[in-house]
Regions:
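Catalytic or ion-coupling anion/metal-binding cores of large enzyme and transporter domains
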Residues: 2-62, 69-88, 93, 99, ...
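Glycine-rich phosphate- or other oxyanion-binding loops that anchor nucleotides, phosphorylated ligands
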Residues: 102
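Short, well-structured alpha-helical segments in soluble
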Residues: 105-117
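A short, small-residue-rich loop immediately preceding and capping a beta-strand
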Residues: 114-135, 146-150
Length: 531
């Protein structure tokens, strides 16, 4: 796509507040000057809003004030007028179980913050899972020039010589305690080893996935996704972003120019290549809706099919984001997609050029972290959409984190009516369950458990774990953390609380999962299903 920059100079949006000698203009300038701002900042230069999701209750974002100052430096260097504006910071851990619900509230707040105040362009400082989609949703709705800057992942974790991934090892250690393989005291000892620095999860969880998604969409400078939070190059990225947004305002390069259907195809294929979170499905559909780009669940299945998962990171593989950065980061992965004919190379980015121009010179410096296609974790790594009488509107599964032997499975259902029922019974030694069963949990969707909580990766019962079993087929209308793993069917739709077929499943019914044929079937009669 060829972008034609707007003419410069021209009158900007902010001048509706600041230009001239009217009472309103003097009112606006006067109040701003109480911060010690010189008069020439109001001379028509671009006003850049730095939307900052800093919060000490959001550990992924607790370092963003430093990055905000670096963006500010960059804006000044490019001749702009920077203003730091705090916006709603949604922490996945802090807002459990309703974080998804607050994503939408945050998106609305961001949209109104931009619409209601005197900005010509925005830089969105994001980190934790929901902050990235919420800020991009809000900014896309207003459609002013926008760049995203991620806070970056935390450093690798280590415990007793073992590489430890945030989130992923929380689930593993928790299961080990239930299986009697780890003491509660050791679990607590491992706690500090998981989180050694500021930043988001060091696995390919939802935060790193969404950082990768906005880079693949073209909404960040190239290389944004993987730079560790405490690496000095993260600060450089922020400062360069501050410089770039000023030129974007002058050129009038907006999200609607960048967020095309071709850009979303690039992002969905990137998600397959990195083994990204199932939560990206929900977020990208929402972002596309805000910008008016047609995007469906079927697009996810169609575009991700036959894209190999080449990024060997937890929870699907063995490495962490720090190694991913050293190996070449996301530009190297996008380049590999381009070489395989799986990239819309001329899709526009915030640079003003095509994505291929940004990645064509990228290098892969560790081919055990970024694998060759013939050694991929899975040859078809895209998010799978299964349908059938149990999920007429679809359900999703992440193949890179699933057990191959369970991708074709028929088993007896063990049903939990909701999360409380699950918690009450899962450790009961008399529970009639073994590893061949299919665990089913109802009423955890958007209505049933407001916020569609990340509880779909139900922990296995202790008596199964003690056999050395680490995975079973699990089905729910919930979400799961991007750091989690297993043969887990999620987002089953319609959800149980809306009267979807999931609501009628009973313990003892048989369920068939057939990933290759995209089928999820409840083995009961049509009459029973309708009743």
């Amino acid at each position: 796509m060829t972008f034609k920059p707007a003419k410069w100079p021209r009158k900007l949006r902010s001048q509706e507040w600041f230009a001239g000698t009217s009472k309103d203009a003097i009112y606006h300038r006067s109040w701003m000057k109480n911060q010690g701002l010189p008069a020439d900042l109001f001379d028509g230069r671009p006003v850049i809003g730095i939307l900052n999701t800093f919060s000490e209750l959001n550990p992924c974002n607790a370092h963003l004030n430093d990055l905000a100052e670096r963006v500010k430096h960059g804006v000044y260097e490019a001749g702009g007028f920077p203003v730091i504006v705090p916006v709603f910071s949604v922490s996945e851990s802090g807002f459990r179980p309703t974080a998804m619900m607050f994503r939408n509230l945050a998106a609305m707040a961001v949209e109104e913050t931009i619409r209601g105040q005197q900005m010509d362009g925005v830089v969105c400082l994001v980190g934790c899972d929901k902050t990235t989609p919420s800020l991009l949703m809000g900014a896309a709705s207003v459609d002013l020039p926008t760049i995203m800057v991620s806070g970056g992942p935390m450093l690798n974790g280590y415990y007793r010589g073992e590489r430890v991934g945030s989130g992923t090892h929380l689930w593993k250690f928790s299961e080990a305690v239930k299986a009697g393989e780890m003491t509660a005291e050791e679990f607590v000892e491992a706690e500090a080893s998981m989180s050694r620095s500021p930043g988001s999860c060091n696995t390919m969880g939802t935060a790193s996935t969404m950082a990768s998604m906005v880079e693949a969409l073209g909404m960040t400078l190239s290389g944004n996704a993987a730079i560790p939070a405490v690496d000095s190059r993260r600060r450089v990225m922020a400062q360069l972003t501050g410089r770039r947004i000023v030129q974007m305002v002058k050129d009038d390069l907006k999200p609607s120019d960048i967020l095309t259907r071709q850009a979303f195809q690039n992002a969905i294929r990137t998600n397959a290549a990195i083994g990204g979170s199932t939560n990206a499905v929900i977020h990208l559909l929402a972002i596309a809706g805000r910008i008016g780009v047609p995007l469906t669940l079927n697009d996810w299945d169609d575009w991700g099919r036959n894209v190999p998962t080449v990024v060997n990171l937890m929870p699907s593989g063995k490495y962490l984001m720090e190694e991913f950065f050293y190996a070449g980061g996301l530009p190297a992965v996008i380049k590999r997609l381009g070489e395989a004919g799986l990239l819309n190379k001329d899709a526009l980015t915030v640079s003003g050029g095509g994505v291929w121009d940004e990645v064509k010179d990228a290098r892969i410096d560790n081919d055990d972290v970024i694998l060759p296609a013939d050694k991929a974790l899975t040859q078809s790594g895209g998010i799978v959409v299964v349908k059938g009488n149990l999920a007429p509107d679809g359900a999703v599964l992440k193949p890179s984190a699933a057990t191959p032997a369970l991708m074709q499975h028929r088993g007896r259902a063990v049903v939990f009516e909701d999360i409380d029922d699950y918690k009450a019974r899962i450790e009961d030694e008399t529970l009639d369950i073994d590893e061949t069963c299919v665990m089913v949990m109802k009423n955890c969707g958007p209505r049933g458990y407001p916020g569609m909580a990340e509880v779909g990766n139900m922990g296995l019962p202790p008596k199964v774990l003690r056999k050395g079993i680490t995975d079973m087929v699990r089905i729910s209308d919930a979400r799961m953390s991007g750091t989690a793993y297993g043969t887990v069917v999620l987002h089953t739709s319609p959800e149980a609380a809306r009267g979807g077929p999931l609501a009628v499943v009973r313990s003892g019914d048989f369920i068939e999962l057939d990933v290759a044929n995209r089928r999820l079937h409840l083995d009961i009669s049509e009459e029973e299903l309708k009743s």
